[in-house]
From Swiss-Prot:
The gene is rplW. One of its GO terms (molecular function) is rRNA binding. The keyword Nucleotidyltransferase does not apply. It comes from the Bacteria. This is Large ribosomal subunit protein uL23. It comes from Campylobacter jejuni subsp. jejuni serotype O:23/36 (strain 81-176). The lineage of its organism: Bacteria, Pseudomonadati, Campylobacterota, Epsilonproteobacteria, Campylobacterales.
Amino acid sequence: MADITDIKTILYTEKSLNLQEQGVVVIQTSPKMTKTGLKAVLKEYFGVTPKSINSLRMDGKVKRFRGRLGQRNDYKKFYVKLPEGVSLENTEA
């Protein structure tokens, strides 16, 4: 089952800040997280039931380090639409 430790961070980019005005929060998680798992974590730890969840899988970038090729970790990104007047900032985990 999914756990709160699978959530890496809430993303604060230009695009995600524009989406927050529409009630959408962008969450970065480990690749094994699923929509139903994220929904259960949000309900258990934050007390929030999302209206909808969209997900996409992001491959880690290939980078050079000391002349060798390496790869950053893969992750999943979730776009979570929250009910009106609810945000994850005013809830305590």
